[in-house]
Amino acid sequence: VGAGERSANRSGSEGAKKGKLPYLRKDASDRKGQPKSATTIMLQTNRRGRGRMTSFEQAKEVLKRCFGHDGFRPEQEMAIKAIMGKRDVLAVMSTGAGKSLIYQVPAVALGGTSIVVSPLVSLMSDQVGKLLDLGLHPAFLNNTLSLRAQETVRNRIKNGEFQILYVAPERLSNPAFLSAIENLAIPLVAVD
């Protein structure tokens, strides 16, 4: 999962210094569970003076409000703290361990349109259906859609109407798709 922009001030593992994706390990965090090399970002939450919250606190709020969960699993928390701190993450977890939330929660919390690359058309449809049921704004763009439907989705992409967009890997080389995302704010790209 890429958090969009790389931190200019990287400290931590040798892999990070060499430009490789760091692996999240339990020993890579401090006593509070914060990844050692993550940067905490402060975001304004609203205009009513609620103050400022860290981006991870914002992710916890999204988890509760949008997904109905009270807390993250330990592996999810470590990965999401890193993502919200603008760090790249490679999360290798078993089926059913909650990998999707690792990119879905930050996608909603960060705003803009996050792109999820998935080779599985059935997964795209399933995930979009679940997110729609939660009141979120996802979409998928693949060859199962008619040409007219693909054009409609591309136009809505250009307007920034989606929070999460699922695409197949080959879509990343499609000129019409690249044109549609050209001016988007893309805070996160995930490969699922």
Go through the PLM ranges and name each one:
Residues K60, I115, V121-V167:
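Conserved nucleic-acid-binding Ia/Ib motif block in the N-terminal RecA-like helicase ATPase lobe
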